[in-house]
Design a protein with these regions (language model features):
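C-terminal binding/interaction regions
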Residues: 2-19, 85, 89-166, 170
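Long amphipathic alpha-helical segments
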Residues: 9-111
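Short, well-ordered beta-to-alpha junction loops that form the rim of enzyme active sites
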Residues: 62, 169-173
Length: 173
């Protein structure tokens, strides 16, 4: 993959075709493979097989999994949540997302649950993207300050454009 590749999300919903897509993270960094999630089983497999990684992404995948399940069987809310919860029993964001979805959807008529499940999953995705962007914005300011400090403290032959920072990233980078 190019270091200058365009920015992508790791999960997204395509209104055209009514489908959920993920980047298969087991293939990174050697290949960029897009997988379409069409069923609850697909969402469960993506979580279990670690095709999606990172706590927020696992929770968002589960939320879309509930939507996919309800599309196929409008009566499946509780069983879908149970199956998804079993994929990673210790994943806090997974349990949190499923609790949020269950609480919101149980209060609705079955006929309204499908559209609401999609809206909730998309809102979780948007909220997480905003949080990650804020993390990036804060981190950028810190990195700029560190680079400036490094440029000022190094001998002249190593400063300026030749100064660099070595960065190791984790999770939400």
């Amino acid at each position: 993959m190019s270091e200058h590749a365009e920015s992508m999300r790791t999960i997204w919903y395509e209104t055209e075709g009514d489908k959920v897509c993920i980047i298969d993270q087991t293939q990174l960094p050697h290949a960029l493979q897009i997988i379409t999630l069409e069923t609850l089983a697909d969402a469960c497999r993506a979580i279990t097989d670690m095709q999606v990684r990172g706590a927020p992404l696992i929770g968002i995948t589960a939320a879309f999994g509930v939507y996919l399940s309800l599309k196929q069987n409008p009566q499946s809310l509780l069983s879908a949540c149970q199956q998804l919860a079993a994929t990673r029993p210790t994943a806090i964001n997974l349990q949190w997302a499923l609790t949020q979805i269950q609480q919101e959807l149980q209060a609705l008529d079955t006929a309204d649950q499908i559209g609401s499940a999609l809206s909730l999953a998309r809102q979780l995705l948007a909220d997480d993207a905003g949080a990650c962007s804020a993390i990036g914005d804060n981190g950028l300011q810190i990195l700029k300050a560190l680079l400036k400090q490094k440029q000022q403290s190094q001998p002249s032959e190593q400063s300026g454009e030749n100064a660099c920072l070595n960065i190791l990233t984790h999770c939400n980078a």
